[in-house]
Regions:
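Helix-loop junction within the histidine kinase core
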Residues: 98-109
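Conserved catalytic submotifs in the C-terminal HATPase_c
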Residues: 108-113, 132-144, 180
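Primarily the dimerization/phosphotransfer
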Residues: 23-65
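Short alpha-helical segment of the dimerization/phosphotransfer core of two-component systems
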Residues: 29, 82-87
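Short alpha-helical Gxxx[C/S/T] motif in the catalytic ATP-binding
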Residues: 221, 225
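Short conserved segment of the HATPase_c
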Residues: 196-208
Length: 265
């Protein structure tokens, strides 16, 4: 019986040793993935920052030359302003992304009329759009009260609409809102633009994934949209079957028990 006891102890210790080795290997792989992700992030950040910084440096130097005419001076100033705004957006996007990932971004939930918010967003996008496409809002609803962070919800809608304007020179861009079920609202942004290739759709919400490498942007916008929507209790996706452009959809919960409630998370 003593021999059987020792055999049992040895088997149990061997099992624990194997489990410990497996756990150590898992931790090692997680650490390696974390290092790779951080290195890729820093590499992409360096590339994205370098482009506007080079423009700021180069065109600022041109402005110091006394021989340039007023038209050239104006063009240089415009380029400097555009790249300053791009650099600021990149910094803000990185701050937002980091805050969301570590749970440091504060969400202030209060009752908001989603229909009114959508109309305000359309008005804002109409004023800043750089396209001939019509920007529209469509809904069968007179109003729809949501317990949400209106600023963050607005941020997502503006991001999706501005993305659509970059790839829709003609035609239309439509923001639609409907009540999908008793407890779920469905938002969608549909455009008649160039669309998104199937191979890109699967990784469209990845960091630094750009729809067009030649277009200005940080490549972080859709990642931020996804994280915000998840914090609001919904989910976001691209419609793989829509072929006349692109269509992004996301859900938002309607919680009747929370009517009249305000909170910070």
């Amino acid at each position: 019986s003593l021999i059987i006891f020792f055999i049992f102890r040895i088997k149990r210790n061997n099992k624990r040793l194997i489990q410990s080795q497996q756990e150590q290997e898992k931790v090692k792989k997680q650490a390696e993935n974390s290092i790779r992700t951080k290195s890729l992030f820093l590499s992409n950040m360096s590339h994205e920052i370098r482009t506007p910084l080079n423009a700021l440096s180069g065109f600022s130097t041109i402005l110091t030359e006394e021989s340039i005419d007023e038209e050239t001076r104006k063009q240089c100033n415009d380029i400097i302003q555009q790249n300053s705004e791009l650099l600021l957006k990149l910094i803000n996007d990185v701050i937002d992304l980091s805050s969301l990932e570590i749970g440091k971004m504060t969400f202030k939930f209060k009752i908001c009329d989603a229909v009114g918010l959508c109309r305000n967003v359309i008005d804002m996008v109409e004023k800043i759009k750089q396209t001939h496409a019509d920007v529209r809002f469509s809904t069968p609803l007179d109003s729809l009260e949501l317990l949400t962070d209106s600023a963050r919800l607005q941020q997502v809608l503006i991001n999706l609409l501005i993305n659509a304007t970059k790839f829709t020179s003609q035609g239309s861009i439509t923001l639609q809102l409907e009540q999908q079920t008793e407890d779920t609202a469905l938002f969608s942004v549909t455009d008649t633009g160039t669309g998104i290739p199937k191979e890109k759709q699967k990784k469209i919400f990845n960091r630094f994934e750009k729809l067009n490498e030649n277009a200005q942007g940080t490549g972080l916008g859709l990642s931020i949209c996804q994280l915000i929507i998840e914090q609001l209790g919904g989910s976001i996706w691209i419609d793989p079957d829509y072929e006349e452009g692109s269509r992004f959809l996301f859900t938002h919960p309607i919680d009747k028990s929370d009517q009249g409630k305000e909170e910070t998370r």
